[in-house]
Amino acid sequence: MSDDDKRHMELARLLVSLFPGRKLNGFLVGLLHSLSGRYRLPKELRGDRVPSSSKLARFIGTLDRERHIHSYFWDLLRRERPSRVGDIDRVARLWEEEGHWKGLESLRFPAGEVFPQVARGSSDNNGAPPLSFTLSHGDPKSDPEPSSPSRLVNTGLSEAERPESPLASDQCLVTSHAYFFWLEVGAWIEGSIEDEPVSLPEDLPSGARLRVVLFSSPGGLVLQPDADQGVLCIEGDGRVVVERPACVPPALQSRELADRRLFFPLRTPQAPGTYRLRCNIHHEGLLVQSRDVVLTVAEQPQRQSEALRSRVDYALSQTLSPTHLRQLGSATLSVLLNDDDWGTHGFRFVGGDDYRSSVHLDDAMLQEMISLARGAFRRASWGSKERYEALPSRPPYRYQGAQSEARLREDLVMMARIGRQLYDRVAEQLGQGADGADALRERMRLPGHIQLALKQGARHLVPISIFYDHRLDVALKDFTLCEAFIRASVASEPLEKSPCFQGDCPHREDRDVVCPSGFWGFRHTLALPFGMAAQGERGLMDLPGVLRIRDTPALLIAVSEDPDFVLRDNHLMRLQAMSGVAPIQVARSREKALELLRQQGSHLVYFYCHGGVDAETRAPFLQVGPLTDPYIFRDTLRVYDIRWRDPAPHPLVFINGCHTTELEPEQAIELVSGFVERAGAAGVIGTEVTIFEPLAVGFASRFMDAFLRRRLSLGASVREARLGILQHDFNPLGLVYLPFALSSLHLAGEASEGTSVAGGAGALVTPPA
């Protein structure tokens, strides 16, 4: 064993003896927080179980190699365990003897203070000189504390009679009893049930507000309706305090505790079992973190490993840093689909003015909603609700050729009937029946931003773009098309500026008139950003809201050489002629595509290709280059080390793909998420159903002009492309495009602050001759 290994093992054994059980986890989490969030605690060191000394020693070796085992570390240990100073100094001397404290004058600690000298006082009884620090500005401190308080997010449970005393994570709750779920941001709290505590950054601006909202499932834990949300605020001194409590426990003896800890009253059900809470943190209406809280309820008090636990399973921002929070933008309505343990799905709605509600659908109803929506898109595209490849003959693309008002009316009526039924199924379960549906309808009348949050392991993509909320009698047979829309479509002004799409359609209350502005996907900007919590492949990368450019954005295009793509070459020529874009790189083979993907610097990666599902492995793929070239799978990204790393841009990936075996979004999600989680993309654009080449070219051209040349946000660019196709081609199928990214994602110069601006791999088939 080398001298380094011996030092690491000695320190590991010391830490195990200093911090028994979960206390070791708390110390390590606090230590990593002091290192500005650069490291994550390995899985084997999390939880209540004491890790082996060898595993802990390996982690210490990582810190040692980065020069983090220095005087500040040992001083922290002395403060934490003053009764064990002798043991601490004995191990510390192993580092001092090897000269590991040299060069401390160059260290900058998280508080932002430089320690140019290590001043030594008189020796203690153990012969080791205690350390004191002299700050660069000449203000000596014998026992320095960070200038900013810790900002770990702690959650836990306490009994209603003793709200200030956290329950241990191995303590089961008891049936039919009252408790408090609590959340506090600060130093590590004994009794916190977080699997992996997430820290708020030290530089959150004064006045920043975080809204914490709790949800439960029917038949489970009972929340108090008027005490299920609270607000935290960042004070000028950096502390995180309660601005608006959810509830102040009557038995709470410490008013000071109520000023920093949110308490949410709950009652356990009569039956023992495992129950869940959903704890959401919102900033400016946008869901930025969500926790799955799992609680074990027993008939009698008892101990059980991990009886109480909280796990972050959705996080647009791991760090909640102010810069990143500003990039995320805002949301008028945030919707999280949450699977529970009984085969049902909970929609968690959160909006402004304290709006929050839940809808619960069983699996069969949700699947039917998805099938109805995709069937409507298929009927509009090729005249049948069946999948394209399942048909005995290949029907033509219905929107080939000149625009037709009659065809558009037929398809909009068909889609509106389905969209209205889907909207009613969700809206009328919002807690107040028809009143709940009307309240949501009025809330969403004006154009806004809708976030459909895709948490880890999402299996369903809810078709909210087809939701239709104008007052429509779906039983009628004869409908007319809104004449205000017809007039606006032939005007020079873009549709998004017309009264209908600003929430003022004159036929909004008419039961026999259909207007495309009634569809959420036309009136609002929609986005489905991945929450990447606990996705180890991409480390600590926050989902970016800004793509930095120096002069012009860089575009990489990978194309299929299928000769049936008759619009491809002209499409590429038009993109290459687009002003304000750097020279475009084009890959016409798989080998070249992988080579260019490995390079750093692209802001948008565009696949104009085939795709599908492999017959043997059922894995989704993309096919570029000659038809004889091998496929690109999710694993291909790892095999070829395709990963976009800072400081290079994390590009947006646009998949305009076709396949002979239709790739449904639930299958495509594996490939789509791979570009985000494994390769580090900012997001992905895909489609709900098979698309034809004219639609692919029309949508992509409009989107890229808005996103790359005019630098609108992704959400605004997608909406503009949808409405452009609707206005100029009388084609509603722009609704099939899905943006798996932040709606606020946009291009910005390197000197820009990056504040937000305005505003599934699908299938592409060539129309039969």
Swiss-Prot record:
Residues 118-167 are annotated as: Disordered. Keywords: Antiviral defense, Hydrolase, Protease. Its EC number is 3.4.-.-. It holds the Pfam family CHAT. It is an enzyme of class 3 (hydrolase). InterPro entries: CHAT_dom. GO terms for molecular function: peptidase activity. The keyword rRNA-binding does not apply. The keyword Transcription does not apply. Probably a dedicated protease for substrate gasdermin bGSDM; cleaves the bGSDM precursor, releasing the pore-forming moiety, which integrates into the membrane and triggers cell death. Involved in defense against bacteriophages. Expression of gasdermin bGSDM and this neighboring protease is toxic in E.coli. This is Probable protease Ga0334635_1659. The lineage of its organism: Bacteria, Pseudomonadati, Myxococcota, Myxococcia, Myxococcales.
